[in-house]
Amino acid sequence: MRATMWDKPPVTCESCHKDTMSNANIQQHVLHKDKLSCQVCHSLAYKNCANCHTGKDAKGLPFRTLDPSWLDFRIGRNPDKTAEHPYNYVVVRHVPTNADLFKGYGIIFPNPNAVPSWRMTTPHNIQRKTPQNASCDACHGNARIFLTVDAVKPHEREANKNVIVDRVPAKTGR
């Protein structure tokens, strides 16, 4: 049994596009080859969730609540580099964990800051052309798409310190 869904080798772009990374005609691939996951350039906004809670109703039946989800696109630092995911930057999404997640069952997380609430994700919305790959400066200098400290709620910053992007890449003028 796998510990996480990331324990199995991922499907790669090269599984179908054999010469994608070796093609010297794609300058962005040559420049960013081992620094960015493919999704950083080829994914769109996707679903994020927050504040999942469990509990028991007046009859003692378990229930779950969740704040409304939202669409967002964020690039974060990769805190869990592996041979299959060696990239410095990956697409991240907010997951609905919090200290009170299982409070209704009498379980309190002893250290909610031990695990980030912004996690690496592999969205299923890959496209060749996306807003962030329209030009170099559609990404470089665009703080809106990076998981900066301002994009993280103050009470989640400690847990996400290894995912938060300290400095947005500077504009290139291209």
List PLM regions with ranges.
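C-type cytochrome heme-c attachment and multiheme electron-transfer modules
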Residues: 1-174
